[in-house]
């Protein structure tokens, strides 16, 4: 099976190999058949799993990295505190994370990396939704959602963040 990827490249989708009884003999693998005779089994090998991962990467990506469907993304929403050293930012980000974790796979990145580095890192990893929150957002009662697919930013009220994240994730296939 060799499905064609969107860029015209064929990907070997699955393989099967018939090994006969050679490996069974070499490793002393035996069984007793219905007539009570000792036999060596005939063996086969089948492969698909790692090729499936390759197909996802080839199909769901662009020049900036992966674009993972929410169903397979290990992280569905990354929360990036902007100016996290400012009072209240990490606390608000943590509260949003706790709310979203009830229904989504969420990561709150409170590392010391720069905000730009974090944006790039999670875009490359294919995280479907990025949530940005900083002091000005908190003051206004909002946060910013960014879609990995469209790269569009949407300012949403913190009170509606769970519904807005759900709607954004549904737009990604």
Where are the predicted features?
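NTP/phosphate- and nucleic-acid-binding module
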Residues: 1-173
